[in-house]
Swiss-Prot record:
NCBIfam families: PRK00129.1, upp. One of its GO terms (molecular function) is GTP binding. It is an enzyme of class 2 (transferase). Keywords: Allosteric enzyme, Glycosyltransferase, GTP-binding, Magnesium, Nucleotide-binding, Transferase. Transmembrane segments: none annotated. This is Uracil phosphoribosyltransferase. It comes from Mannheimia succiniciproducens (strain KCTC 0769BP / MBEL55E).
Length: 208
């Protein structure tokens, strides 16, 4: 599995602001979008381009355009919605595919409760977004679902990742790419990433 920890100073600065205990909902939400945008920039650096000729202000001019790669952004409900706009800033034509997961209280396994995927997802690059990669269970289940629907090209963007989640994701899906703003220290006994961001969903949506 390709693993990229984006160490750009802007990413580190903005993530540091998100870690503050007193960060407001508005600021956290804005920062999630901004860091998502910066991660998208890194994750799409290998998109193939082609030369096309257009009519410029002074006549015909050759320009580069993305070559034939259709994209769908896949936010995992609900926290993933907080990063979605950051992807769409760069790829406004991307289709949106939504996956909802909940954790079974007895088995502790993720269970999909909602999905609405692009009808031609097998032809698209899927960019899956979720702020946290903790145990990796929800992400693995989401990628399982995408592959079942025929999706072959998958990249994952997360704000923070725990080593435990990275290991689990690599074991389950070694063919995907993972981009994160930070590889944090560990998971605590309650499954929270340390130092992490706390409950990213609550902070994005202003709920407790």
């Amino acid at each position: 599995m390709k693993l990229v920890e984006v160490k750009h100073p802007l990413v580190k600065h903005k993530l540091g602001l998100m870690r503050a205990a007193d960060v407001s909902t508005k600021h956290f939400r804005e920062l999630a979008t901004e860091v998502g945008s910066l991660l998208t920039y890194e994750a799409t650096a290998d998109l193939e381009t082609e030369i096309v000729t257009i009519e410029g202000w002074c006549g015909p001019v050759e320009v580069q355009r993305i070559k034939g790669k259709k994209v769908t952004v896949v936010p995992i409900l609900r926290a993933g919605l907080g990063m979605m706009d950051g992807v769409l800033e760069h790829i406004p034509s991307a289709r949106i595919s939504v996956v909802g997961m909940y954790r079974d209280e007895e088995t502790l396994e993720p269970v999909p409760y909602f999905q609405k995927l692009a009808s031609d997802i097998e032809e698209r690059l899927a960019i899956v977004v979720d702020p946290m990669l903790a145990t990796g269970g929800s992400m693995i289940a989401t990628i399982d679902l995408l592959k079942q629907k025929g999706c072959k090209h998958i990249k994952v963007l997360v704000l923070v990742a725990a080593p435990e989640g990275i290991k689990a994701l690599e074991s389950a899906h070694p063919d995907i790419e993972l981009y994160t703003a930070s590889i944090d220290d560990h998971l605590n006994q309650d499954g929270y990433i340390i130092p992490g961001l706390g409950d990213a969903g609550d902070k994005i949506f202003g709920t407790k």
